């Protein structure tokens, strides 16, 4: 997890505005994506951390699990989930990114193959069947539990515009990081956004 950054916010107290810090967290992964090996290595370390990737989505099953978690397919509080980039199907969103990014290269590769068995029919499927990660996930959180504890739902939903700006900025600043889906969770104490 990246070290929380903070920005100033103003709070009205005793007839005057006072400045306070608003925490900003940029998580590069979570235990739900961490491989069994990474969990085992981390468990053996005093710090509980590992240098092994834990933001990687390693196969189609992991991607399906991310879809269920991020979209709360198992929950009745779907009204507290907002997808602001992509659709309500993260698996298809990732497949679409693969098509957009790799289809031309796949066709060119296939045109250069003399043997049919070396041609790639579906690049997403090929990566899923390999040992390579198929996607990764980051989490952006603005504010912390102390900040959000006393905020009502209407105030929380104002964050949609802020998170939209975060996605636009990420696309602009890191254009090679392709975003398939961005979903905000308002169902926890501190709203946060999952980006795949």
Regions picked out by a protein language model, each given a short descriptive name:
Residues 1-196:
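N-terminal nicking endonuclease/strand-transfer module with a His-rich metal-binding environment
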């Amino acid at each position: 997890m990246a070290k929380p950054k903070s920005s100033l916010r103003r709070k009205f107290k005793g007839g005057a505005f006072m400045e306070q810090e608003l925490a900003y967290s940029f998580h590069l992964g979570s235990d739900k994506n961490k491989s069994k090996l990474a969990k085992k290595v981390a468990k053996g370390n005093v710090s509980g951390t590992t240098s092994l990737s834990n933001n990687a989505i390693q196969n189609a099953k992991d991607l399906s699990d991310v879809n269920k978690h991020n979209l709360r397919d198992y929950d009745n509080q779907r009204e507290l989930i907002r997808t602001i980039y992509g659709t309500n199907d993260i698996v298809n969103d990732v497949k679409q990114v693969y098509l957009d990014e790799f289809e031309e290269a796949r066709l060119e590769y296939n045109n250069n193959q003399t043997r049919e068995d070396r041609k790639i029919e579906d690049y997403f499927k090929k990566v899923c069947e390999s040992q390579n990660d198929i996607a990764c996930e980051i989490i952006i959180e603005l504010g912390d539990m102390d900040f959000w504890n006393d905020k009502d739902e209407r105030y929380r939903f104002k964050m949609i515009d802020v998170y939209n700006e975060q996605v636009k900025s990420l696309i602009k600043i890191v254009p090679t990081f392709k975003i398939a889906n961005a979903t905000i969770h308002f169902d926890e104490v501190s709203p946060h956004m999952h980006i795949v």
